[in-house]
Amino acid sequence: MRIIAALILSTVACTCLAKQAAVENVRMWPAPDRTRIVFDINGPLEHTLFVLNNPARVVVDLRDTSLGVKVDRPTDADKLLQGIRHASRNHRDLRVVFDLRKPVRPRSFLLKPNKQYGYRLVVDLYDKGDVTKSLKETIKRSAPRSPSKLRDLIIAIDAGHGGEDPGTIGRKGTREKDVVLAIAKELKQQIQNTHGMRPVMVRRGDYYVGLRRRMKIAREHRADLFVSIHADSFKDPRVRGSSVYVLSRNGASSEAARWLAEQENAADLVGGVSLDDKDDLLASVLLDLSQTATLSASTDVGTNVLKQLGTTGKTHKRRVQRAGFMVLKSPDIPSILVETAFLSNPSEEKRLRNRAQQRKIAKAMVAGVKGYFKHNAPPGTRLAGRSHTITRGDTLGAIAGYYGVSLRDLRKANALKGSDIKIGQVLEIPTFSGG
């Protein structure tokens, strides 16, 4: 009888232990506006979160959970998180304490399994001061520009995926998030070296940015163009070539476009973005169908970029494709998504890993963008069609400096051999200096 009772108790104990969740990995992703901590767990769990002050801490209690992995220290670059401590409570629960460098606004949510990950508990720590700072910057950027001052074109560069979302992964282990960030940084450098243009990086490091947040960043900086950079993937490894996509109102233009849009738009599920931050104004704007002019401009700039990409290698389609990518839905900013090559193709995976090839791809994109804005620059920008009427005290050198063009190009545009100019003379200002 004692043996039977012992067996029953043993069985009950084993059953209870089997129900306990386990943390299998802890990942941290510091970003400019927050730090994200992701707990990879082997099943659903219940948790509570609360904040403590003096010193600033965030505490997360995970019910019926054990921790069987080593937790790394936060990096010195993390502006919010100083350290992580953990301990068992009641021999059943797990308490995790986040020691902070400054007060934060925490948020947590549980994510169900997807193709890449199992269950995950996500804890986001937002900088409390970031809200005020962001609001001030938005108001400042929204202020009317002085009509007498010429401005640079603003190009928003969006490196796809990031952080816990690696994007597609090639056979050699190449992660899309890494190669597109490398290309984006190269594109940024080349745009900085182009007269009349200024780059804005949507993602500057290895962290995830929500799809709608990417559009919002472009809008906050009043971008004239949004360029999202990706690496393609398809079930057939023989498929290769570059593609350029613009938004489709009526569905995707091909089977590959439909399949790809489903994969890319699912990134928010991988990245763990909740629906709390989708304000009504943005939602209504996204549903607005009055995008004819923007879609037309997107197609035109996309055509120019695709043509230039054809000089660096094979293009997958001869024409700009259309698909329902979330990041292309800004109603007032021309937007294109560039699939640089197929990571699912072994030879193109090798190409995307090559620094020289990354530079060529970026150079082709810049050439395509310049080709479009050469004839379509918005009024008030340095690249818009311009002329200058000579007044007393003007010199050719001073005019060239004011408009940011070289003296050589200014002379060439006006068929001038020397530096002699006359009051009342009208000079044409070249759109791009040196090209």
List each language-model region with its residue ranges.
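Sec-dependent signal peptide recognition
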Residues: M1-S10
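N-terminal signal peptide c-region/cleavage motif recognized by signal peptidases
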Residues: A13-T15
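Signal-peptide-cleaved, periplasmic/extracellular N-terminal interaction regions immediately downstream
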Residues: L17-I155, A398-G401, S406-R408
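Solvent-exposed coil/turn segments that connect beta secondary-structure elements
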Residues: A31, N42-P44, L52-R57, L62-L67, ...
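Active-site-adjacent mobile loop/cap segments within catalytic or ligand-binding domains
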Residues: H47-L49, V60, K235, L286-R382, ...
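Catalytic-core regions of hydrolytic enzymes
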Residues: K133-D280, Q291-T303, R408-R411
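Stable alpha-helical elements in mature extracytoplasmic
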Residues: E176-V179, I183, L187, R214, ...
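Extracellular LysM carbohydrate-binding repeats and other cell-envelope/extracellular binding modules
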Residues: R386-R392, G401, S406-G435
